[in-house]
Structures are given as C-alpha cells and as structure tokens.
C-alpha cells in the first residue's frame, strides 16, 4: 500500500533529451513550429520522420539546420537573377542564329527570281526590234518594182510623182514612231512617277491657323526599311519580329517603340502602319514576372530588332557581327560566374 501511494503521489516522469520520441510527440513538436517555419516544410518533415527513431536533440538540430538554410536562401536571390539573365542572353543568341540560317536560305531564292526577271525583259525587248527593222523595207521594194514595169515613155511625169509618194510610205513612219514610243515609254513613266510622288508629299507653307509646318517630307529621308515585301519568307520574319517586340514591350508600348525607330531613321511611316495592322489580332501571355512588358527596351533588344530590319530590307548580315555578339555574351557569362564565386 505504501508503494502504491508513493507511486500515485509522485509526479509523472519527464522525458529526457536522449529518449526516443513517439510519432504523436513528433507531430506535436512540429505543430508548435508553425509560426517559425512554413507549412510545406513541416509537412515534409512529418513525412520523412515517420517510422524513424529520433530524440529531441536530433530534432532540435534538424530544425536549426532548416532555419539556417532558409536564411541563406534570401542571400542567394542575386545568384538566381544572374542565372535568369544568362538564360535570356542564350535565347537571344538562338534567335540571331535562326536569322542567319534564314538569310542563307533566302539568298538562293532571290538569285533565281533575278534570273527570271532578266529573261522576261530580254523576251519582251526582242520582238520590238524585229518589227522595226523588217516592216518598212518590204512594201517599198514591191510597190516600186510593180510601177517600174507599168511605166510608159509618154507618162514619165505621173510615174515620177507616184514613185515620190511611194518612197516615203506612211507605214514606215508609224513603225518608227512605235519604236521611238516604246523606247521613250520607260523614260516618260519614270518622269511622271517622280512628279506624282512630289505632288503627293508636298505640304502647305502655312497652316490654316496662321502657323507654318516644320515637319520634313518623308521622301527626303532615307530609311533602312522603306516598305515590307509581301513574299512568304519576309512575312514570317515580320510576325517573328512582332512576337519579339510584344513579348518585350506589350501591345501598349508597341507604337512608342516603332515611333522611336522612325525617329532614328530605321523604318518609314508606311512600315509602321503595316506592322500595327498585323499586330491587331496577336496575343501573347506572360507567365513569369520578369517577362512582363516594359516601356523601354534594352540595347541588346534593339540590336535584335536591327537585325530583323536589315534582313527584311534584303541586306545580308555579316558573320563578323554575330561573332562579336557571341564574344560579348561570353564575357558577361564569365563576369557572372566570378560574382557567384565571391
């Protein structure tokens, strides 16, 4: 009886740090840490500690180690930003390499089209020369020979007058006139086109409100890209370029970017109107926060758009420019790796 009373009055035994905890005790211990640790970390600890023998000291060490790792994670945000920048640079390199492959493939098609146009011009010019040389000679010889046979000694005056009329026949004048007209048609058309263009873009000297217009005429400027060709290859390049610009600046800032390129002298107003017309039905979603639209582009983004403009204008892209870009990107990568090692 005494032993029973002692045992009943004695306080319950406290678990020491070296005793192994049960699963219920581990769950209670981890539930108390919800204010210090995130919920997903607590769930992972519960799943990993099931069926394992763990003391309180070991559990304390595990929790301390996790808190240290989480505190270091904030310091490593800068290294993650550098890695993301390197990934964007690699994507730009891939886009530049695709442009070079497209340039090589389109060179052959352009050469074939030039050969076809030259052949058509030669075929069109050939029949004009034959008509101008053959037609005026035949009627003169035939009519003169017939009237020489019918000439009599008593009718010399009449035959001489007829011969004079035959020597300068009307069809000869027409053929010569046709040849001269065909030769001068191209020159006349060129002169008329120049006059029409100047008339279209002439601006009034004074505005209706009394002020003077100081805006320059568009034709006086020389743009890198005056118009967009309508072949399949150039249209695919246009949509790829629009996709790139919208992914960087969005639809809201696209007109501002194109206006900036017009002021620099890269694209004309006609090109801006066509690009805005093509971009009406385009939609691009932004999943990551870093790829959201910006009001201004980086210098590397302007370089990529300049390469698109040069390709659409039909000018080949030098391989030396691409090599210089690759060298600069490698330098940036080395600089980022050195920052990570510090």
Swiss-Prot record:
InterPro entries: Arch_fla_DE, FlaD_prd_arc, Flagella_assembly_related. GO terms for cellular component: archaeal-type flagellum. This is Putative flagella-related protein D. PANTHER family: FLAGELLA-RELATED PROTEIN D-RELATED, FLAGELLA-RELATED PROTEIN E-RELATED-RELATED. It comes from Methanocaldococcus jannaschii (strain ATCC 43067 / DSM 2661 / JAL-1 / JCM 10045 / NBRC 100440) (Methanococcus jannaschii). Keywords: Archaeal flagellum. It is found in: Archaeal flagellum. The lineage of its organism: Archaea, Methanobacteriati, Methanobacteriota, Methanomada group, Methanococci. Its main location: other. To M.voltae FlaD, also to FlaE. The gene is flaD. The keyword NAD does not apply. GO terms for biological process: archaeal or bacterial-type flagellum-dependent cell motility.
């Amino acid at each position: 009886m005494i032993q029973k009373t002692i045992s009943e009055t004695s306080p319950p035994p406290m678990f020491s740090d070296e005793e192994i905890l049960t699963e219920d005790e581990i769950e209670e211990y981890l539930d108390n840490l919800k204010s210090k640790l995130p919920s997903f970390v607590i769930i992972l600890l519960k799943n990993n500690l099931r069926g394992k023998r763990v003391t309180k000291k070991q559990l304390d060490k595990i929790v301390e180690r996790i808190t240290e790792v989480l505190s270091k994670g904030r310091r490593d945000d800068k290294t993650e930003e550098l890695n993301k920048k390197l990934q964007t640079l690699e994507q730009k390199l891939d886009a530049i390499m695709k442009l070079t492959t497209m340039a090589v493939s389109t060179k052959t098609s352009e050469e074939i089209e030039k050969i076809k146009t030259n052949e058509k011009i030669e075929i069109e010019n050939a029949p004009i020369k034959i008509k101008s040389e053959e037609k005026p000679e035949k009627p003169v010889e035939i009519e003169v020979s017939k009237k020489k046979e019918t000439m009599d000694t008593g009718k010399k005056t009449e035959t001489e007058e007829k011969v004079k009329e035959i020597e300068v026949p009307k069809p000869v004048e027409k053929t010569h006139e046709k040849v001269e007209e065909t030769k001068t048609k191209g020159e006349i058309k060129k002169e008329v086109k120049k006059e029409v263009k100047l008339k279209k873009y002439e601006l009034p000297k004074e505005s209706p409100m009394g002020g003077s217009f100081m805006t320059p005429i568009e034709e006086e400027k020389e743009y890198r890209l005056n118009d967009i060709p309508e072949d399949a290859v150039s249209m695919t390049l246009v949509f790829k370029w629009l996709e790139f610009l919208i992914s960087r600046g969005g639809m809201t800032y696209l007109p501002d970017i194109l206006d900036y390129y017009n002021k620099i002298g890269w694209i004309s107003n006609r090109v801006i109107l066509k690009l805005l017309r093509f971009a009406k039905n385009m939609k691009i979603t932004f999943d990551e926060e870093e790829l959201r639209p910006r009001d201004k582009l980086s210098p590397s983004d302007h370089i990529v758009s300049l390469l698109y403009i040069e390709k659409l204008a039909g000018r080949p892209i030098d391989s030396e420019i691409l090599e210089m870009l690759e060298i600069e990107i490698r330098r940036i990568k080395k600089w980022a790796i050195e920052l990570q090692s510090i």
